Amino acid sequence: MNARRRHLRAAACLTLVGLLACLPLAAAFGSVNEDDMVLRLSAAERALPPDRLPDFDASCAALMDEDGTLWFGRNADDAAQIASLTKIMTAIVAADWLDASTMIEVTPEAASVGESSAGLAQGDSMTFDDALKALLTASGNDAASAIAQAAGARMLAQEGSGGDAHACEAAFVEAMNAKAAELGLENSFFANPHGLDFDAFAQGQYSCAADVATMLRAAMQIDLVRANIGFSQADITVQRDGAPVTLALENTDALLGSYPGACATKTGYTLAAGPCAASAVNRGDGHKYYAVVLGSSSKPQRFVDSAALYDWAYANRSSLRAPIADEDIAGLAWGERVAFTVAWFMEGW
């Protein structure tokens, strides 16, 4: 092993030792398990006791950092319903095709989706910027379909064809799955732009906590999406029957404005998915984290679960580092960095 690799392994060792040596005692042990993963190795493999893991009750979870490293996972790769977290991918794909000022028209099909709504009516029109707020703040299924149909129409036009609202939305969903492949999401399949998963909308869609974290990380790198995913409430203007109408939008989130550094949250719920949330925290300390919880025991609990993951990360991620250039470590593939980390941890435990 050359000197550079020895230094890199030492750096990885120091980082993980800093993470694991300082873990606080958990308040209760009922919501941790030996299959929970720290840097892709289970608590059992690391011989970690429950009091050295985050305590929360979601059935699936992922905690990812700005580099895409999965620091913690619980059933993070298991297929699950993600409900309205699907709208994160809708925003990502639409931003490839629509500008902030692009006008979005609400079709009869979009207005009639049902369930979670931004209060849009057939014939309403608004800018894509406002439509994103309706999508990400109010979690409007009407907004999701309207956006998908507008972007899908452009996709079909580029191919020299066209179609009705259903054809446009189908083209958009195809693009969602293409984007999933581009982002390396290996455990995701999208069937609609809003995430409904029952009755006519039960079309075999699925994702997983780790893939949703990757989606949110990608979304936060898009200026227009990032600017519209962090509102607790927002007002938008739609043109309705030839006159401007203001719609007040409310977010069901409980992290924004209350949890330190919370800068983005998307919530979701269906009976199949249970309460879920994807969120981002940035405290300006050089680290950004993305937490995803699926299948929490209640809607309020999904925010408690998210906070538990962030608390664990901020309490335990050490800044200790061997005297080696950051770019040397960053230049390694994620898997190679973790391989060094795991090897040193297992040797020294």
Predicted region positions:
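N-terminal Sec-pathway targeting helices
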Residues: N2-L14
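Beta-lactamase-like hydrolase cores
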Residues: L14-T15, C22, A26-L85, D96, ...
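Penicillin-recognizing serine hydrolase domain
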Residues: F29-A58, G152-G348
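Residue-level preference for non-acidic, small/hydrophobic
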Residues: G68, L85-A94, I104, L135, ...
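Alpha-helix C-terminal capping segments
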Residues: V93-L98, R283
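Short, well-structured active-site flanking segments
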Residues: D96-A110, L224-F231
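Conserved catalytic neighborhood of penicillin-recognizing serine enzymes
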Residues: V113-R154, T246-A264
